[in-house]
């Protein structure tokens, strides 16, 4: 494992911890899209079908369990916790996320590295993760005002993907035959979706003002 992969994993883990801190400590999910969280839960469920059959390392299995467990717990909190669910803005979070799921599934059935159930589901998870942030970004544009923890959560998610791109570049030049077009293209699309948010995030940090996205 290289430093970029480790930085990506730790940044991803930090993003989850920030969101759990907001939900568990403040007992609020205001500004958080349940649609995006449900998509992430589906991403990890379909990606880690091999969790109990293919052992790579203790680190790898631990990270899989953490991301799978945390994503499901966040969805549970937002749907069922008697206090947290009251802060969920259902009227604003109206992005039809099934319109993301179905095209990603069809694309995975057509474009994959091997036509097996696990491989198609893994490919589906890659495509879905690339666009899973869209309901969250739409929600933020509608509400405009973004609290610090939500802003940090989204920034860390974008940073995680950026580190993974650096990881791929590093491995391309240091490992023979390291070519994964599906992962690369999906990861690049995912990173580009954060570009607008990054711009306003750094402007807010530079000017020491509250983070707001244009409507």
Curated annotation (Swiss-Prot):
The record's keywords, sorted A to Z, are: Endoplasmic reticulum, ER-Golgi transport, Membrane, Protein transport, Receptor, Transmembrane, Transmembrane helix, Transport
Subcellular location, in the record's words? Answer: Endoplasmic reticulum membrane
Pfam families, from UniProt? Answer: ER_lumen_recept
Query: An example of a Gene Ontology BP annotation on this entry?
Result: protein retention in ER lumen
What membrane topology is given? Multi-pass membrane protein
Any one GO MF annotation of this record: ER retention sequence binding
InterPro entries from the UniProt entry: ER_ret_rcpt
Cellular component, GO annotation: endoplasmic reticulum membrane
Q: Which domain of life is it from?
A: Eukaryota
Coiled-coil ranges (or none): none
Please give the residue ranges for the topological domain Lumenal.
1-2, 54-61, 113-119, 171-181
The family line of this record is: Belongs to the ERD2 family.
Record-given protein name: ER lumen protein-retaining receptor
Gene name as annotated: ERD2
């Amino acid at each position: 494992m290289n430093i970029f992969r480790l930085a990506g994993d730790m940044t991803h883990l930090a993003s989850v911890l920030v969101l759990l801190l907001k939900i568990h400590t403040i007992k609020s999910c205001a500004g958080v899209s349940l649609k995006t969280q449900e998509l992430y839960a589906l991403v990890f469920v379909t990606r880690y079908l091999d969790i109990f059959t293919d052992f790579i390392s203790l680190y790898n299995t631990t990270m899989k369990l953490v991301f799978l467990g945390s994503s499901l717990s966040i969805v549970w909190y937002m749907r069922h916790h008697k206090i947290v669910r009251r802060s969920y803005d259902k009227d604003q979070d109206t992005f039809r996320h099934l319109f993301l799921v179905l095209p990603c599934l069809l694309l995975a059935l057509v474009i994959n590295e091997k036509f097996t159930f696990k491989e198609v589901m893994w490919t589906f998870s890659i495509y879905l993760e690339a666009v899973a942030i869209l309901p969250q970004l739409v929600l933020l544009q509608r509400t405009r005002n973004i609290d610090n923890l939500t802003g940090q959560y989204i920034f860390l998610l974008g940073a995680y993907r950026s580190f993974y791109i650096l990881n791929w570049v590093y491995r391309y030049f240091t490992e023979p035959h390291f070519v994964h077009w599906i992962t690369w293209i999906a990861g690049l699309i995912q990173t580009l979706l954060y570009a607008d948010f990054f711009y306003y995030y750094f402007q807010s940090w530079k000017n020491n003002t509250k983070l707001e996205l244009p409507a």
